[in-house]
C-alpha cells in the first residue's frame, strides 16, 4: 500500500492508496468506521462521460483527515465490487457537483443513480445557497478550487488543485489529455485525487452552517431538482445521424464557397479575423470612427447592421461575411459537435446545471437548447423522438409576466390575465391613447417595455431594441407605469430591500444578492428566480407522476418530451396540466403542442 502525507490547516492528512488486493482489508475497516458519512469523488479520463473511450480511473473516499484511493484501472472487477459495496453501506455521501460523479458511477460501474441520490449532500448546492454569485461578481465561486481558496486556503487551491496543470506541462501535453495519460500511481496524481475528498469534507463542514435559515428548506428541494436533471442527462436525445451529417457537409460546402468569394474578391483570408474584414471595408471607402479598447477597428453586430442599412457593395460584403461566419459557427458549434459527441447508441447527452445564474436560472451544455435560433428548425431537426414516439413541447403562457402580476399584486395586470386581454395593447393604449390597435407599431414598442420591465430595462433599453427615439421610449415606459402602478410600487419595495440588506429573498426562501449600486435589478432577479422555481416545481411533479424517462430538455419556460405516438396528445395535455401553477390570484397556464418525429417539426420541419 502507498501512503502519502499532506498538511492542511495545521493537520497532517494521510492518503492511503490500495496497491494489492490484501490492502483492501484496511479500506473496508475505514468504510465501516465511517459508514455514517464520507466524501466520495472519482477521477476519469475526461468530461465526456458518454463517449466510447471514457473510463473511470480512480475512486476516492475520505474524511477531513484521511482518504483512501482505489485504482480501479488496476483492480478492475474487484475494485468495482469494492466501490459498490462501500457506497451501499454509507448512510450519507458528500460530493462536489454530485451529478457528474453519480453519472460516472452509473455509466462505468452500473451503480444506478436512483440508489445513491437519497444519500447525497452536494457541496456545490450548499455553496450556491450561501452565495449564488460567481467568483468575480462579488461571490466566492462554486468550483472546488474556488471553494478551497475561500474556506481552506488560497495556497492549497493553487498548489494541490494546480497539480494536474503542472503535470500536463511537465509531460508536454494538454490539461484535457493528462487525465487519461498520467501514470496511475504518479504520487502527485494520487495526492490530487486523495485530497479532493479531504477538501470536500472540510468544505461541507464550513458551508453547512452558513446556509441561511430561510433557505434551509431549499437543500432537499435543490437536490431533488439536480437528481431529476441528472436522469434527463443520462437518457440523452436521439440524433438523426444521416440528416446531421448531410447538413454538416452542406454547410461546410456553402461556407467554403463564401470564403472563396471573400478571399478572391476582397482579400479576406479569415472571416473571423476582424482586422482582415475591416481592411476590406476600408478599401470600399469606409472610414472607421469606432475602435476597441485595444485600438483595433470595431467590427461587431452593430457595424454589420449599419453597413447593410447603407446599401450597395458594403451591404453585399457585410451579408457575405455574416453568412460565412454563421455557417461556420452553426456547423462547428452545433451540428458537427452533435456528431462528434454522440454515444454508441447515437444519443447526445445534455448536462443541465439547474443552479447556474445568480438567480438560479438553469443552463444547458451538450445540446445548447437555450442558444439555438428561436424560429429556425434546421438544427432542431437533427434530434428525433424515440422509435414509435413523436415530439411534444409544453411551454408556459407568458411565464415571467404572470409571475410579475402575481408577486406585484397589480390589480389591472391580474385582471388582464384573467380576462385573456392583450397586455401589450393595454400598455400601448396607456402610452399613446385608445385609438391604438394590435396592428400598430406602438404595440410592438409596448411589448418590448412589458418584457423589458421584467429585466430591469428602462427607456434607453427600449430605444436601443426598437430603434425608436428616447422621447417615445420614455412615453411607453411612462405608459407602463401608469397602467400597472402595482408593479412600480413592488419594484420600489424590492429596490429598497436590496439597498437596506444587500439582498432580497424570493418566495421559496432563496437569498438573492443585489449590488447596492444596481438595486433596480432586484425586480429582474426576483421574477427570473421565481419563474425558474415555477419550472422546477413542475419538474418535480412530472417526476413524481412518472414522466421523467420521456423528458428530453427543460428550457427555462418550456419542457421538450418524446412521447409514444398513440398517447402523445394525452401525454402532452397531462404534462401541461401538471406544469400549470396557481400563484395566488394568477394562473400560470401552459400550451401543449405535439409534433412529428423530429424536434424541428415543432418549428416547421416536415418530419
Swiss-Prot record:
UniProt xrefs under Pfam families: DNA_pol_A (PF00476), DNA_pol_A_exo1 (PF01612)
Keywords, ordered alphabetically: DNA replication, DNA-binding, DNA-directed DNA polymerase, Exonuclease, Hydrolase, Nuclease, Nucleotidyltransferase, Transferase, Viral DNA replication
Gene Ontology molecular function: any one: 3'-5' exonuclease activity
Superkingdom as given in the UniProt entry: Viruses
Swiss-Prot/TrEMBL GO biological process terms: DNA-templated DNA replication; double-strand break repair; viral DNA genome replication
Catalytic activity: DNA(n) + a 2'-deoxyribonucleoside 5'-triphosphate = DNA(n+1) + diphosphate
Protein EC: 2.7.7.7, 3.1.11.-
Annotated SMART domains: 35EXOc (SM00474), POLAc (SM00482)
Region (Polymerase): 214-607
Ranges for domain 3'-5' exonuclease: 1-213
InterPro entries with a match to the protein in the record: 3'-5'_exonuclease_dom (IPR002562), DNA-dir_DNA_pol_A_CS (IPR019760), DNA-dir_DNA_pol_A_palm_dom (IPR001098), DNA/RNA_pol_sf (IPR043502), DNA_polymerase_A (IPR002298), RNaseH-like_sf (IPR012337), RNaseH_sf (IPR036397)
PANTHER family in alphabetical order: DNA POLYMERASE I, DNA POLYMERASE NU
Described function: Replicates viral genomic DNA. This polymerase possesses two enzymatic activities: DNA synthesis (polymerase) and an exonucleolytic activity that degrades single-stranded DNA in the 3'-5' direction.
Family: Belongs to the DNA polymerase type-A family.
Protein's UniProt name: DNA polymerase
Source species taxonomy: Viruses, Duplodnaviria, Heunggongvirae, Uroviricota, Caudoviricetes
